[in-house]
Amino acid sequence: WFIGIDGSFAPWVGSVINDINQKIAIICPEGREEEVVKRLARVGYDNTVGYLKGSFSTWKKEGREVGVVIQETAPELAEKHSKTQNILDVRKPGEFAAEHIENAQNQPLDDVFNSLKELDTEKRYHVHCAGGYRSVIFISILKSKGYNKLIDVKGGYQALRREDIPKTDFTCQTTQKEGG
């Protein structure tokens, strides 16, 4: 799975890697290996088995299989948007409740393994979060489980909200009452 070092790394490691004893191999930019090991250890993940010397470029040079995440821009999605498209919003429920694309499904990243039960491996899904970090993690996990028709929406909801695409009305979550 891919969890980017330059985002909210530690919280997402804790959310998506359920087994604290999981063996972890690191692929990161050269020179940042020690940083990743320390950041993993700070949140209790001490089972790092090693790192790929030379980073991702070594993997590619050796001709090993590389997974890719297909991206579309928000304008590209808006241009072809229809109510029949499958749009997955992987933001937290409160973010989704505040405002979202009409007919989007909320499948929060921190609940990704339950999403496996609800999604069809044969369907194409456009996936977004707020800005693009969480959606790539979500996609990398699903791709490892056989979901290959996933498209990341570049720029996430921040980019989508500027497009002429049907959205729910904004509701400030700090003023919304429990149960209402």
Where do the PLM segments sit?
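Rhodanese-like catalytic fold shared by cysteine-dependent sulfurtransferases
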Residues: W1-G180
